[in-house]
Amino acid sequence: DNCRCERRIFVDYSGRLVIADKAWSDNPATVVHQNFMLSPQMRLVEREENVLIFEGNRYGLIISQFVAANCVVEHGLTEPIVSGWCSVNWREKEKTYQVTFSQEGSGLHFLTKFQVFEKEKGIAKTWALESPSPEVMARLAL
């Protein structure tokens, strides 16, 4: 398949991260994946439709997907094989979570938001459900 991809990343003043991925293909049966791998210390604590909440010992992470996409959360050995920090191969040492969003078609896009939070302070799920502002959407060219 003749396939092209583009990624735009926006970080706002409060440290929230928005990733917009676009993909174009000549074949409408093309499946495109957006993958994220989390550290072994993170564990899935809540899943509601398009919102995933992970927590570690001190911090947590909210992942929100705003474009209809299949979502698979896997826990275990990661593919592709990745080495961790230094010379340790984390794939052999500890299992991780891998989040995969996927879509099928010839003109696809993903809109994913991330928010790191301190567990002591709790989380604001309302933010997870809010669409990015028109200014952010314009900067991401969506």
What are these regions (language model features)?
Residues 1-142:
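CBM-like, beta-strand-rich accessory domains located in the C-terminal region of large
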